[in-house]
Amino acid sequence: TFDASNQLATSLYNPVAHGRPDWSARAISGNSLSDPRLTNKIQLRSLAVGDTMGFMSDQLLVTVGARHQTLKITDYAYNTGTRSSSYDQSRTSPMAGVVYRLRDDLSLYANYIEGLAQGETAPAQNNGQPVTNAGQSLSPYVSRQKEIGVKYDAGGTIYAATLFSTDKPRGLIDGSNTFVASGKDRHQGLELTVQGEPMRSLRAVGGITLLDAQQRSTGSALTDGKRVLGVPKRQLSLALDWDTPWVEGLSLDARVVNTGSFKTNSANTLEAPGWTRLDIGTRYLLDVQGKLVTLRARI
């Protein structure tokens, strides 16, 4: 059960202990965890066609294509199970890419792609007050992504640098406490990656992403031009995969991810610190009746 109407003088940044309050008339229930009610249904169908053409003895490769998508979204009320909103939209979107080989080991590339994507879902509350359209999805939108980059193959070690830009509609809660689409979030950045085999049986992939994510056309001086909440300015990653010499088919892997600090509200008055995560795992390949089976474990 969730209740957004009872307000207590506390916060995550300055917690104060309180006794359990009574449920208000606006409390909503997700029902039993063993038999939960349906609250959202999403159906996506997609069909894509494309072709790559070579020119100048394949020094220049051009790929063009299109993708037809049908996206159906239906939302249901928590307490009653009745349908609260639905969308059924279709679109045919273009995609294109170009690769130009300056040398056998050096290439320039660029691509552009559009696609139909699900809109954001309205939160249950805002500043302790229930949102009028809680749980409802915004209308599907068209995502657009542009990339341009360079790739260099230094005898098995591949270096790449990519500039990218993406736009998506931005959801916000208006003066009537209703979640609506207003403005857009623009993500622009630079991604640097390197991958190769520094020693026999050891594969490595590492990179850094520098991000400039801004809120645009929000209609408010408090948020326009501010950083998108939850998006750090930088992210580092390193992944290693090693084939062990003592057991054939057994591999060990590890991945480290580090991010910078990020804003936790649209006005950028609150900030959360960066974090580091370590993932480790193992993979074992074995033959089962003539078929290769992969067993994985990860923490």
Question: Where do the model's predicted regions map?
Answer:
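Conserved C-terminal beta-signal and adjacent last beta-strands/turns
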Residues: A110, K146, L229-I299
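Surface-exposed extracellular loop regions of Gram-negative outer-membrane beta-barrel proteins
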Residues: F2-A9, P15, K72, M95, ...
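Residue-level signature of outer-membrane beta-barrel architecture
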Residues: T52-F55, V98-R101, P140, V150-Y152, ...
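Membrane-embedded beta-strand positions of outer-membrane beta-barrel proteins
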Residues: T1, D51, V62-V64, A96, ...
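Gram-negative outer-membrane beta-barrel transporters
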Residues: S57, I158, L163-D167, A181-S266
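Residues that define the transmembrane beta-barrel architecture of outer-membrane proteins
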Residues: K41-R45, D88-T92, V142-K146, D153-G155, ...
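Signature of Gram-negative outer-membrane beta-barrel scaffolds
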Residues: F2-L106, L116-G119, N133, G207
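Short loop/turn motifs that connect adjacent beta-strands in outer-membrane beta-barrel proteins
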Residues: T1, F55-L60, R103-D105, G155-G156, ...
